[in-house]
């Protein structure tokens, strides 16, 4: 199945619902006239975003079932025979949510409540309390994630695992680099379309940068409206099979530690209850990252030594180097065998000595050859005379 998708962009005026509804109605009609079947509107599309108080938010919020904005969108979807996704402040009678709705010619299909709040949300909205949903429609399986939700991989990943083919994202995005690399990453890593509808303009001193766009399952921007009012439109091809060769298959068995992680808890309380040794004092230190592209092992080793020496002279205490920096990126198995480094290679002793001289810890990537002759893409923390394998990805 193929059809046109569209991302609507306009300057949303704060607390002026009538003006905003008129603007979005005009642009939705334009998009539908150009053949769009799935049209995405910005986050908080009729109200503006930076509410000063709960009172302001309450004044603008609507019930999903019979609110002014939803009624208008239902009428448009029915008249224009299209599907609309739009963000709005929702009132359920007791609480307020930053929500988005999916509406089709048949009426309201479903909603999503924003799970990851940005600063303005915290003044009025309750965090989304419903699980991720994917909605089956005549134009495919549609997921919804609102703005900041896209900054976290879990929501888009769950949407894809539940069958989403298109992820619609109403935005109030103010990052200057647009379309954001985050949008492209979510499309690429999940192999699904992302339609991101952002607003433009200034609200209370905060600039919204526009750049609404459509990203295909390969992570390519196939439509973008950089500035001002307008529409980004592109073909949605549900039969498109993205090339997954660059992204290895998921390996959930390696992610189990996430279920046992303790980071959300107060560290002092955790250590008081479970630690066998005192909690280390926090320290500030200087760190550095270094970009390089060595063509072979010798060139890579020289570049690494120079980077360590420079970091030491600058007083850095941690240096992070690129993946596969020792040897470069192999084109095939034969080349990987040539650049692979054994676990007992003298290079580790030399690197350990060098980092000890310069008082800097180093993290770097390489291809390692195990004793069983299998090769792995690994990363290593080199600290004094001690090297620790941090991660590995088998390629045997």
What are the residue ranges of the model-derived segments?
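Active-site beta-strand/loop signature of hydrolases that rely on acidic residues for catalysis
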Residues: 20, 28-58, 77, 84-85, ...
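C-terminal beta-strand edge segments of enzyme domains
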Residues: 133-136, 193, 199-284, 309, ...
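Short beta-strand scaffold segments in enzyme catalytic cores
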Residues: 86-88, 99-102, 133, 196, ...
């Amino acid at each position: 199945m193929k059809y046109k998708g569209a991302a609507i962009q306009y300057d949303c005026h704060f607390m002026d619902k009538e003006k905003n509804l008129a603007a979005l109605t005009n642009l939705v009609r334009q998009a539908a006239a150009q053949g769009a079947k799935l049209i995405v509107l910005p986050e908080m599309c009729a109200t503006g975003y930076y509410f000063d108080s709960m009172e302001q938010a309450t004044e603008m919020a609507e019930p999903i079932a019979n609110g002014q904005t939803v009624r208008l969108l239902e009428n448009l979807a029915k008249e224009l025979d299209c599907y609309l996704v739009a963000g709005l402040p929702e009132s359920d009678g007791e609480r307020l949510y930053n929500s988005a709705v999916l509406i089709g010619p048949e009426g309201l299909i479903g909603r999503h409540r924003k799970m990851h709040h940005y600063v303005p949300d915290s003044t009025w909205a309750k965090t989304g309390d419903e699980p991720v949903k994917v909605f089956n429609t005549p134009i495919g399986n549609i997921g919804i994630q609102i703005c900041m939700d896209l900054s976290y991989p879990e929501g888009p990943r769950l949407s894809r695992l539940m069958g989403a083919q298109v992820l619609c994202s109403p935005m109030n995005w103010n990052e200057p680099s647009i379309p954001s690399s985050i949008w492209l990453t979510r499309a690429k890593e999940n192999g699904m379309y992302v339609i991101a509808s952002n607003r433009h303009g200034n609200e209370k001193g905060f600039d919204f940068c526009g750049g609404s766009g459509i990203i295909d399952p390969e992570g390519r921007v196939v439509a973008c409206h950089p500035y001002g009012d307008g529409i980004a439109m592109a073909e949605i091809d549900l039969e498109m099979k993205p090339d997954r060769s660059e992204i290895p298959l998921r390996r959930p068995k390696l992610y189990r530690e996430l279920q046992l992680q303790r980071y959300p808890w107060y560290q002092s309380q955790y250590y008081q209850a479970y630690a066998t040794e005192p909690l280390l004092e926090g320290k500030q230190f200087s760190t550095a990252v270094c970009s390089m592209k060595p063509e072979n092992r010798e060139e890579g080793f020289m570049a690494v030594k120079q980077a360590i020496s420079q970091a030491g002279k600058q007083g850095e205490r941690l240096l992070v180097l690129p993946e596969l920096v020792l040897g470069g990126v192999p084109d095939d198995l034969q080349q990987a065998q040539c650049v692979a480094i054994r676990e007992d290679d003298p290079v580790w002793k030399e690197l350990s000595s060098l980092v000890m001289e310069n008082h800097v810890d180093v993290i770097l990537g390489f291809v390692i050859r195990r004793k069983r002759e299998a090769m792995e893409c690994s990363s290593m923390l080199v600290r004094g005379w001690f090297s620790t394998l941090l991660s590995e990805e088998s390629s045997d």
